[in-house]
Amino acid sequence: MKKVSVIAAAVAATLAAGSAFAVDFNGYFRAGTGISGNGNADQAVNKAGTGRLGNENDNYYEFGFAEELKTGEQTWKVESMIAQGNSGANGWEDGDFNVAQFNVQAKGLLASDQEAVMWAGKRYYQRKDIHITDFYFLNTSGTGGGIENLSVGNQKLSVALVQDGDNTNSSGYIFDARLANIGLWENASLELAMAYNFATEKDSKNEVADDGVLVSAILHQGLSNGFNQTVFQYGTAGYGAQAANFWGAGSYYARGTEAFNDASGFRLLNWGVINLGENWEMGHQLAYLAGSDIGGQFGGDGANKNTYTGKSFDIDQYSVVVRPMYKWNDTMRTVFEAGYNAGEKISNGGLATEDFGNAKFTVAQAWAMGDSFWARPELRVYGTYLLDTENDKAFGDDDTEFVVGIQVEAWW
């Protein structure tokens, strides 16, 4: 009886505390499965370049708790998040749970600027992404600290230092600086960002990778029927290789190799979502990416098998993705998505020129909690046609594949 009483008291205390603490439960997940024509279960190809709808063959989950604690004019936010991903092939799967976020953000500490926020810990730091391709084009997340939303006239300045990797020779870091809310014309604003990735060498060690710089300009245009965003990014060294590919940009800088020291690259992106009438909405991505002296070939035997050969390549590619959606009512919609990504790796120093390309077309019948393009949760059944334009054996013995599947996506 005593044990029951203790449990009952704990439950009662928890329920009573609910009125005193406003804990925010938030998260995101996607999960589903598909059947492909070649019998290899679900298939997915290059979603950053051709679109993610009907083109994801994994499950991914993240859930977090956050609470704001107020004292006087100050607000202290404690934020946490756990993330995990797997293939979804079995009902019970082993997988590492990652502490994606655990940080404290304090607003109101500066009497001269009550909106400025000081923070420290592990954090998704002001990430920038294109939703329909799941492409994070600026992402310097990690463990660190900084201050954000400092008032500089009408603009907002944010600076941060974030650790980015550690190896036997060095420890990597990102210095991130951003200036946002730069007013232009009506409903238009500009954000400028600079990420400098550098390393500190350990005693008697030498880091062969050069530091890199990534600069970004993000133009946001509000429209009467939606929004449009244009992004230009330029990177050097390891950031040059990232900018020339759909690899994201910010963290996971290439250390321990000189392969990218001479690299430079840029990308031009345009994306947005617009309302095309009472029943239609459409999202899109347009992208052009290019780079030169991208390290491309490693060789050697034994302990030298990963030695950079000095042979590299130039690269250019483009991507077009459109996702129109027809709304039958407040819940049911039919969603189409077509995408094409193609380019070439141009020989430099003896490598052969290599063309590459993928195309995808998806039709999905979906039901969502609301009629907006962004309404979630959303249940989908879909059919997807995949094409590899350069590899005749991309899908078993064929260059095409068809997948039918079901998926749910939610955020809250």
UniProtKB/Swiss-Prot annotation:
GO terms for cellular component: cell outer membrane; pore complex. It comes from the Bacteria. One of its GO terms (molecular function) is maltose transporting porin activity. Keywords: Cell outer membrane, Ion transport, Membrane, Porin, Signal, Sugar transport, Transmembrane, Transmembrane beta strand, Transport. Pfam families: LamB (PF02264). It is a multi-pass membrane protein. Residues 1-22 form the signal peptide. The keyword tRNA-binding does not apply. Involved in the transport of maltose and maltodextrins. PANTHER family: CRYPTIC OUTER MEMBRANE PORIN BGLH-RELATED. Belongs to the porin LamB (TC 1.B.3) family. Homotrimer formed of three 18-stranded antiparallel beta-barrels, containing three independent channels. This is Maltoporin. The gene is lamB.
